[in-house]
């Protein structure tokens, strides 16, 4: 084997090493891009779930507000009924 053959072999080995390194670099870039996409999708999913939870929370809150509003309405009705009942009792007492 001549020195030239040895150098040619070394150059070929270096080319292969560079090709492998470039492939690993490209694979790493692809993995990074894939990871970024995965993180984004996960963050979006978490956001959606959180948003869904918030929607559920607001739905429950709306029901609670409706329940409260109905309770206030019925309290007002009962208070008016009691006022009328009391007025009627007072009228009957003064008339009778």
Listing of model-derived features with the role each one plays in the protein:
Residues 21-25, 60-92:
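Amphipathic alpha-helical coiled-coil segments
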Residues 28-57:
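Extended alpha-helical coiled-coil "stalk/arm" regions
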């Amino acid at each position: 084997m001549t020195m030239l053959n040895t150098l040619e072999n070394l150059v070929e080995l270096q080319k292969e090493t560079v090709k492998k390194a470039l492939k690993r670099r490209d694979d790493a870039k692809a993995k990074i891009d894939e990871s970024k996409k995965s993180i984004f999708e996960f963050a979006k999913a978490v956001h959606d779930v959180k948003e869904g939870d918030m929607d559920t929370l607001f739905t429950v809150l709306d029901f609670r507000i409706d329940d409260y509003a109905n309770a206030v309405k019925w309290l007002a009705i009962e208070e008016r009924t009691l006022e009328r009942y009391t007025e009627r009792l007072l009228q009957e007492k003064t008339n009778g």
